[in-house]
Amino acid sequence: MLEILLVFLGGGLGSIARYLMGQLMTIHFPNILSLGTFTVNIIGSFIIGLVISLINKNQWNPQIGLLLATGFCGGFTTFSSFSYENTAYLKNNDYLLSFGYTIMSLFWGFAATFLGIYLVKRG
Protein backbone atom coordinates (compact mmCIF):
# COMPACT_ATOMS: atom_id res chain seq x y z
CA MET A 1 0.00 0.00 0.00
CA LEU A 2 2.89 2.38 0.73
CA GLU A 3 4.17 1.90 -2.82
CA ILE A 4 0.84 2.98 -4.29
CA LEU A 5 0.75 6.05 -2.06
CA LEU A 6 4.28 7.03 -3.10
CA VAL A 7 3.39 6.78 -6.80
CA PHE A 8 0.14 8.69 -6.18
CA LEU A 9 1.88 11.50 -4.29
CA GLY A 10 4.73 11.78 -6.80
CA GLY A 11 2.35 11.69 -9.76
CA GLY A 12 0.19 14.44 -8.31
CA LEU A 13 3.18 16.66 -7.59
CA GLY A 14 4.63 15.96 -11.04
CA SER A 15 1.34 16.86 -12.73
CA ILE A 16 1.12 20.13 -10.80
CA ALA A 17 4.73 20.93 -11.68
CA ARG A 18 4.03 20.20 -15.36
CA TYR A 19 0.99 22.48 -15.32
CA LEU A 20 2.96 25.30 -13.68
CA MET A 21 5.87 24.89 -16.11
CA GLY A 22 3.42 25.03 -19.02
CA GLN A 23 1.91 28.23 -17.66
CA LEU A 24 5.34 29.76 -17.15
CA MET A 25 6.42 28.91 -20.70
CA THR A 26 3.16 30.28 -22.14
CA ILE A 27 3.63 33.58 -20.30
CA HIS A 28 7.24 34.04 -21.35
CA PHE A 29 7.11 32.39 -24.80
CA PRO A 30 3.48 32.68 -26.00
CA ASN A 31 4.23 31.89 -29.65
CA ILE A 32 6.00 28.57 -29.06
CA LEU A 33 3.35 25.85 -28.70
CA SER A 34 5.55 22.97 -27.61
CA LEU A 35 8.13 24.65 -25.35
CA GLY A 36 6.42 23.65 -22.10
CA THR A 37 6.19 20.00 -23.12
CA PHE A 38 9.74 20.01 -24.46
CA THR A 39 11.06 21.55 -21.23
CA VAL A 40 9.31 19.13 -18.86
CA ASN A 41 10.31 16.13 -20.94
CA ILE A 42 14.00 17.12 -20.90
CA ILE A 43 14.00 17.96 -17.18
CA GLY A 44 12.13 14.73 -16.43
CA SER A 45 14.65 12.74 -18.46
CA PHE A 46 17.48 14.26 -16.42
CA ILE A 47 15.71 13.55 -13.12
CA ILE A 48 15.00 9.92 -14.00
CA GLY A 49 18.64 9.39 -15.01
CA LEU A 50 19.78 10.74 -11.64
CA VAL A 51 17.21 8.88 -9.54
CA ILE A 52 17.60 5.46 -11.15
CA SER A 53 21.40 5.75 -11.06
CA LEU A 54 21.37 6.65 -7.36
CA ILE A 55 19.10 3.69 -6.64
CA ASN A 56 21.29 1.36 -8.71
CA LYS A 57 24.34 2.49 -6.71
CA ASN A 58 22.40 1.65 -3.52
CA GLN A 59 22.63 5.27 -2.41
CA TRP A 60 18.86 5.73 -2.34
CA ASN A 61 16.03 3.51 -1.18
CA PRO A 62 14.07 2.00 -4.12
CA GLN A 63 10.91 3.53 -2.66
CA ILE A 64 12.35 6.94 -3.56
CA GLY A 65 12.28 5.67 -7.14
CA LEU A 66 8.56 5.03 -6.85
CA LEU A 67 8.02 8.56 -5.57
CA LEU A 68 10.34 10.40 -7.97
CA ALA A 69 10.86 8.24 -11.08
CA THR A 70 7.54 6.43 -11.43
CA GLY A 71 5.38 9.04 -9.70
CA PHE A 72 6.86 12.50 -10.20
CA CYS A 73 8.48 11.91 -13.60
CA GLY A 74 5.43 9.96 -14.75
CA GLY A 75 3.20 12.92 -13.88
CA PHE A 76 5.69 15.58 -14.96
CA THR A 77 6.66 14.30 -18.40
CA THR A 78 4.11 13.80 -21.13
CA PHE A 79 4.26 11.74 -24.27
CA SER A 80 0.61 12.40 -25.07
CA SER A 81 1.13 16.18 -25.27
CA PHE A 82 4.24 15.63 -27.38
CA SER A 83 2.15 13.49 -29.77
CA TYR A 84 -0.71 15.99 -29.86
CA GLU A 85 1.59 18.92 -30.59
CA ASN A 86 3.23 17.01 -33.42
CA THR A 87 -0.22 16.22 -34.82
CA ALA A 88 -1.07 19.93 -34.72
CA TYR A 89 2.14 20.76 -36.60
CA LEU A 90 1.35 18.15 -39.24
CA LYS A 91 -2.24 19.40 -39.65
CA ASN A 92 -0.79 22.86 -40.34
CA ASN A 93 1.65 21.39 -42.87
CA ASP A 94 4.57 22.32 -40.61
CA TYR A 95 6.46 19.15 -41.51
CA LEU A 96 9.89 20.59 -40.85
CA LEU A 97 8.81 21.88 -37.42
CA SER A 98 7.30 18.49 -36.54
CA PHE A 99 10.44 16.67 -37.64
CA GLY A 100 12.71 19.11 -35.81
CA TYR A 101 10.63 18.91 -32.63
CA THR A 102 10.73 15.12 -32.70
CA ILE A 103 14.47 14.92 -33.34
CA MET A 104 15.31 17.59 -30.76
CA SER A 105 13.05 15.95 -28.15
CA LEU A 106 14.66 12.57 -28.65
CA PHE A 107 18.21 13.92 -28.78
CA TRP A 108 17.94 16.18 -25.73
CA GLY A 109 15.86 13.63 -23.82
CA PHE A 110 18.55 10.98 -24.24
CA ALA A 111 21.30 13.53 -23.56
CA ALA A 112 19.62 14.66 -20.34
CA THR A 113 19.16 11.07 -19.15
CA PHE A 114 22.78 10.22 -19.92
CA LEU A 115 23.91 13.40 -18.16
CA GLY A 116 22.02 12.37 -15.02
CA ILE A 117 23.58 8.90 -15.15
CA TYR A 118 27.04 10.35 -15.80
CA LEU A 119 26.85 12.78 -12.89
CA VAL A 120 25.99 9.97 -10.48
CA LYS A 121 28.77 7.72 -11.83
CA ARG A 122 31.26 10.55 -11.58
CA GLY A 123 29.95 11.18 -8.14
UniProtKB/Swiss-Prot annotation:
List of residues binding Na(+): G74, T77
Annotated TM spans: 1-21, 32-52, 64-84, 99-119
Any one of the GO BP annotations: cellular detoxification of fluoride
Classification via InterPro entries: FluC (IPR003691)
Membrane topology, record value: Multi-pass membrane protein
GO molecular function annotations of the record: fluoride channel activity; metal ion binding
Localization annotation: Cell inner membrane
Cellular component annotations (GO), alphabetically ordered: plasma membrane
Activity regulation (record text): Na(+) is not transported, but it plays an essential structural role and its presence is essential for fluoride channel function.
UniProt-listed Pfam families: CRCB
Catalytic activity: fluoride(in) = fluoride(out)
Membership in a protein family: Belongs to the fluoride channel Fluc/FEX (TC 1.A.43) family.
Described purpose of this protein according to its UniProt entry: Fluoride-specific ion channel. Important for reducing fluoride concentration in the cell, thus reducing its toxicity.
Protein's recorded name: Fluoride-specific ion channel FluC
Organism the protein comes from: Gloeothece citriformis (strain PCC 7424) (Cyanothece sp. (strain PCC 7424))
